[in-house]
Amino acid sequence: MNNQGRSILTWAALFVFVILLFNVFQSDGLLGGRNNITFSDFLTRVDEKTVNSVKIQGRVIEGTSNDGSTFNTYAPDYPDLVNRLTSNDVNIEVVPLETRMNTFLGFLISWFPMLLLIGVWVFFMRQMHGGGKAMGFGKSKARLLSDKGPKITFKDVAGIDEAKEELTEIVDFLRDPSKFQKLGGKIPKGCLLIGPPGTGKTLLAKAIAGEANVPFFSISGSDFVEMFVGVGASRVRDMFEQGKRNAPCIIFIDEIDAVGRHRGIGMGGGNDEREQTLNQMLVEMDGFEANEGVVIIAATNRPDVLDRALLRPGRFDRQIAVANPDINGREQILKVHLKKIKYNSTVLARIIARGTPGFSGAELANLVNEAALIAARLGKKEVDMHDMEEAKDKVLMGVARRSIAMSEKEKRLTAYHEGGHALVGLYCPAASPLHKATIIPRGNALGMVQRLPETDEYSQNREQMESSIAVYMAGRVAEEIIFGRNKVTSGASSDIKGATNIARAMVTKAGLSDLIGPIFHGSSSDDMYGRQPSNETSEATAELIDAEVKKIITQGYEFAKDILTKHIDQLHTLANALIEYETLSGQQIKNLLSGRALDSEEENKFPFNDSPTIKIDKEKSPEKAKKAKKESTNI
């Protein structure tokens, strides 16, 4: 229990004790003893002349019998009581109520209101001076990081080497400022970490705290603003006063966009409290008073909404981008998290990194944890590559729906659909290496073919885009070849959407259409409120764009059809294997098409290593294929 809880409990116990004490004395004063009789018995004794004397105090009557015994009774409103007593020769003594009251009780009653007010005043004064902070709204909520517990250092941070290098310089400055001051350098006043969620901004701040060996205060941007006017500005002042008293030190503000948004844009219902808080922060960071030795590090994933005055040099001298890691960064991050679990030699961080493009550090940590949970649920002693693959598919596509009731007809159709994707991907030029194919339903998909690029692709050429379109259309083509045009299903809707997006990007953004040319078509400005941008393309040009998109998709469709028609036997073999095994790795598919057995010992041990064993001759691109077909027709 904290100090505030103990203080409230003490005051409550004292109040209850006083009330009980008051009741005890009041009861004792009213009854005066335990020999009580009813008023009817008292009147009977008076009429029988057995009562010698009575002492009346208010409505309480204390009587003495002729034999010397005493008794007590309580009298109602009885006007003839005195006449009845005198007529029966009873001696009467009337005592005022005040003379019988206990001295301590009288003192307590007279002084209790004053004592209560004094006690309440003392209680709140103690709280305002830091006892429980009942009224300390203006106190900063910045928490000083404790030295107890395991420290996080830069060794625990991987995949963001550039950001680590920038922040290491700040840590070195705090440790030995003379090294930089000899050359006239000044300590940076602020550093802003910018990046999407989960990339490690807060982890970097914790690593700085573990490396710097200086006081480290942490606070959230939402901790400044409350319902009371002026509280936010007061907390900012108190936070910087704490920093000055502990300089050199670091103050970390997480999610600074909660308090640092643009001023005067009319958002937030016209609340000026947040703007007052921001103004005070601007003054404290770079005003008339210097804050030597106090370094502000802030983190946000919304730099576009921050006020410009907050971003200028002198306040945040450095803006460090913490982006999602590339393939090498993902591999390093996976190795850091794999150290925390038990795994065997089949787990290859590089393969996992290739299959998780765009993953943040937090998502990779979650993937490793999911793999450990899956292995534990299956009763394994170590995590293997199968568990990592299952965890990756679960994160990307959802939980496997093995309980779904698929008919043999649907299962066969799905096998040919996914087999078409896989086969065209093997023969298509510039297509990424095939990783695996499965017909196990996950999420909204009945199956999946996964291709993993060797490295992260930041741009694509025409050949790569055309290959991707052909692979997208291959599932629909396989359904049409095997089951006929009238039996084609809606399962290829997402494939058609993906192919259309690539084709439209080729025409309107990449300038890869000879008819349209290298001209950008689309909105040249982004709307911060999420509204649909206006169309800047004429109707005539839009018709040409649609025609070009259709032409590119048709070429990819025909190219995929040529491959599947030419290798129809391999399509049947692959589809039958998928029906039997449900999931095949890229290596297993290559072994199958080359006539090798699927259940070799090496393949079962390392099913997802992607080691090439056979060479697949790539077909010509759609443009070259169309040209060759035209020449053969002319001949």
UniProtKB/Swiss-Prot annotation:
InterPro entries: AAA+_ATPase, AAA_lid_3, ATPase_AAA_core, ATPase_AAA_CS, FtsH, P-loop_NTPase, Pept_M41_FtsH_extracell, Peptidase_M41
Stretches of the chain found on the membrane's Periplasmic side: 28-103
Cofactor dependence: Zn(2+)
Cellular component, GO annotation: plasma membrane
Active-site residue list: 418
GO BP, sorted A to Z: protein catabolic process; proteolysis
Binding site for ATP: 195-202
Recorded superkingdom: Bacteria
Binding annotation for Zn(2+): 417, 421, 495
Entry note: cofactor: Binds 1 zinc ion per subunit.
EC category name: hydrolase
PROSITE patterns: AAA
Residues in the Cytoplasmic compartment per record: 1-6, 125-635
Annotated stretches, region: Disordered: 600-635
Statement: the UniProt record of this protein carries the keyword Cell membrane: yes
Name the record gives this protein: ATP-dependent zinc metalloprotease FtsH
Organism listed in the record: Rickettsia felis (strain ATCC VR-1525 / URRWXCal2) (Rickettsia azadi)
Primary gene name: ftsH
